[in-house]
C-alpha cells in the first residue's frame, strides 16, 4: 500500500471514530442535561426547605442570644448579684445562648419590648406595668415574684410645707407613669377623696424626677431605692411611703408564645433565679458588697435598705390577692380600660 492510501485509510478510520464519538456525545447530552436539571431542582427544593425552616425560627434561635432586662433600682440585689456572678451566662451558655442585658428600666418600655420580641425575659417589672400591658391585650405572663417592698417606694417634697394629700392640690408631682410609684400616688390621693386631676402629674423617670425636685421645677417627686435614700439623707421631706397604699409587687415576666416555643429556657431562667437567691443567702456580705459597688452606696446604707425587701420568688396566694387589689384599683381609677384576670397572668410552668 502506498503512503497516500495509508493516509487515506487512517483519515477514514479517524472519521469513523469521530463520528461514533459525536454520536455518543449527542446521545449522552440529554441524559447529562436531565441529571443536571434534576440536581438543580433538588438543590432548589432543599434550599427552599432550609429557608422555610429558618423563617419559622424565632429571633432567639437565629441569633443564639437571649435579651434580659437589667434594672438596679430601687434596690434590686438579685439582678446585681446575678450580673456580678454571671449566673445567667453559666445557665444559658451550655444551652448555646449568649445573654444580652437591656437597659430599659421603665415598665411601659419593658412591656413594649417584650411584646415586640426584642426582649425575652423581664427580670424585675412592676405588677402594675404587667396589668396595664395585659389590659391592652399584650401577650405577657408572670413567671415568678421578684420582690415585695412597699416601704421602699416614697413620695418626697422639698420640705414639710407638703404634709398631706390636700397640700398637693394644684402642685406639680413628677414620677414614672404606669408604675408602682404611680399607683402609690393615685392611691394616696384617692384616700383623701382626690384624683390625679387635682394635681399636675409630670411623667418622667426616677433620676429626672429627683433632679426636678432638687432643682425646684416640681413640688414633689416619686422616688425609690438609692435615690430615695440619698434624698432622705439630704433632708428632703417624706410625704408618704407605699405601706398601706400598694404592695409594691415586682415580678419576672415573659410571653406565653415564648414559653410555648421554648419551655426549657423559661425553666432555665427560674433555675437561675433560684441560684441567685441561694448565692445571696450563702454569702450575704458579698451580696451587700456587690450592691454597694453597683449603686454607689455605702455598705451600711445597703444593709439599712436591704431589710425593706422580700425577695422570695414563690408566687403565694397573698401575692395574687395583692395584684387583684391593684388591678381593681387601676380599673376603678381609670388607669386601665379593660379588666384583667390576674390569675390568668400566672404562667403554669410544667
Walk through the language-model features, giving the residues of each:
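Extracytoplasmic "Venus flytrap"
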Residues: 60-61, 65-84
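Flexible hinge/capping segments at coil-to-helix
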Residues: 157-172, 260-264
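Bacterial lipoprotein signal-peptidase II cleavage site
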Residues: 17-41, 45-49
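Pocket-lining segment of extracytoplasmic ligand-binding domains
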Residues: 128, 200-292
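Secondary-structure end/capping motifs
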Residues: 73, 261-335
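Pocket-flanking alpha-helical
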Residues: 76-82, 102-139, 151-165, 183, ...
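Ligand-binding cleft/hinge of the Venus flytrap
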Residues: 81-97, 182-200, 232-233, 289
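Conserved small/polar residues in nucleotide/adenosyl-binding loops
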Residues: 1-6
